[in-house]
Each structure stands twice: as C-alpha cells, then as structure tokens.
A protein has these predicted regions:
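Helix-centric, low-specificity signal for extended rod-like, repetitive segments
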Residues: 1, 16, 205-208
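Bacterial N-terminal signal peptides that target proteins for export
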Residues: 1-10
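Bacterial Sec-dependent signal peptides at the C-terminal "C-region" and cleavage site
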Residues: 9, 13-26
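Residue-level detector of flexible, active-site-proximal loop/helix-junction positions
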Residues: 16, 35, 60-62, 148, ...
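Hydrophobic alpha-helical membrane context
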Residues: 19-20, 45, 200, 222
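Conserved SGNH/GDSL esterase-like catalytic core that processes O-acyl groups on lipids
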Residues: 23-125
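Alpha-helical cap/lid subdomain in secreted, periplasmic
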Residues: 78-230
Length: 230
C-alpha cells in the first residue's frame, strides 16, 4: 500500500518536473490589414503546435467597414508605426516574432486629386523605423507581402478611393528591398493569392473563406520553417 502510494507520488512529481521544464511556445504577434484579419483564425489553428499567435485586438469595429482601418485592422504604415511606438512603452510587450503587413491602405488614391495616401518615401521611412524600434526590443520581424489588386475589379466597386496593381508591385518592391537589407524573412502572399484566381474575390479586394484558409496554410508553412531554424 505504502509502496503504491510512493510510486504514484513519484509519477506525479516526475510529470510536474517535465511540465516545468517544457519550454513555452514562442509568441508571434500579428499586425496587418483586413486580409490578415480574415486568415488569422486559420493561422492561429495551423501554428498552434509551434507558436502562440497574438494580435492587435479588436472591439468588433474592424468588420463593420473593412475599408476603414479600426480595431484589429492595422491600417497604413504610419498607423502601424504609431501603434508599435505605443506598444513599445509597455515592457510586457515582448513577442519573439512580429508577423507584419501594411500596404493596401498606403496605396489608396483620392479619386478627385489622385493623391496617394502614403507616398513611397514615407512608406520606406515608416518601414525602416518599424525595423529599428522592433530591433531595439529584439523582436524578430517576418514580413508578409501585400496582396494583389485587380484594377478593373476594384475601382468600379469602390468609389471612395482607388487602388492600382502597379502601386502594389512598387510598394512590395520597397518592402522587399528593406527585407533584404536587414535579413528579414518575406512571405510572398501576393503571388500566392494571385494564383488562386480572380473568382476568389468576394468584393473589390477581399477573399472567400477557402482562400483565407489557404493563405493561412501558406503563411504557417513559412513560419514553421523560420521557427525551426532559430
């Protein structure tokens, strides 16, 4: 009886020690546009065995108007930078990885003036500053390219602002150059999403559920490789 109790106690103790020694999963913090908000639930599930996904939180506002960045929608690069500056004041904000995208809101054109929301040089400066402040906190950046725009689909359906694929390509190029400069991994969600076909759009720029799941799986595959390389 006594020996049985001791064996059980020893088993419990060993289990407790093993749990205590288990290294916690790294945290991946996601900031992106409404595209990221749509694939996020799938991504959280797909990487649950290798990382904990956290994200810019929402009060339910982001889904009310996908074209107006509020709540969990990171918005343009200026908004993302300001948000991160605010987060850096919180000493508890220390994810191992920041999974980041901004671009679709940067390239909005005013239909009357044709003025772009964030000019190229400002976009570059904002990304450079994001790299700097996250590096100071030893947060590893993983970049996600901006998804494609089909001018003939987008602009007839969206009268408040226009977007053009030529800007997507140009701004992705700027981001890619910065990624190469600092050795930041970049996930080509642009070409991957384009391969899914024009029929996967539900409106001017957002995707059907099957494509959201595929985007998440594609990103998850890259993240797993990156996490395994550390």
């Amino acid at each position: 009886m006594k020996n049985g109790f001791l064996k059980k106690a020893l088993f419990v103790l060993v289990g407790f020690i093993l749990v205590s020694w288990t290294k916690p999963l790294p945290e991946v913090f996601l900031i992106g546009d409404s595209i990221a908000g749509h694939y996020r639930p799938y991504l959280e599930k797909y990487i649950s065995n290798v990382a904990r996904l956290n994200w810019k939180r929402d009060d339910g506002q982001a889904e009310k108007n996908l074209d107006v960045p509020t709540g969990s929608n990171g918005g343009d690069s200026r908004m993302v930078l300001e948000y991160l500056k605010h987060k850096m004041k919180d000493q508890d904000f220390k994810p191992e990885y920041l999974l980041l995208n901004c671009g679709l809101h940067d390239i909005k054109h005013d239909p009357e003036t044709d003025k772009i929301q964030i000019p190229e040089e400002d976009y570059k400066r904002n990304l450079e500053e994001i790299v700097r402040i996250t590096g100071n906190r030893n947060i590893k950046l993983v970049w996600v390219e901006t998804t494609w725009v089909v001018d003939s689909v987008h602009n007839p359906k969206q009268k408040l602002f226009y977007r053009y694929e030529k800007d997507v390509i140009r701004y992705n190029t700027i981001a890619d150059e910065i990624c190469r400069k600092y050795g930041i991994p970049s996930i080509d969600l642009h070409d991957f999403s384009k391969k899914q076909g024009i029929e996967q759009f539900i409106d001017h720029v957002h995707y059907k559920e099957p494509t959201r799941a595929l985007q998440a799986a594609y990103i998850a595959g890259f993240l797993e490789r990156i996490l395994n390389e550390k």
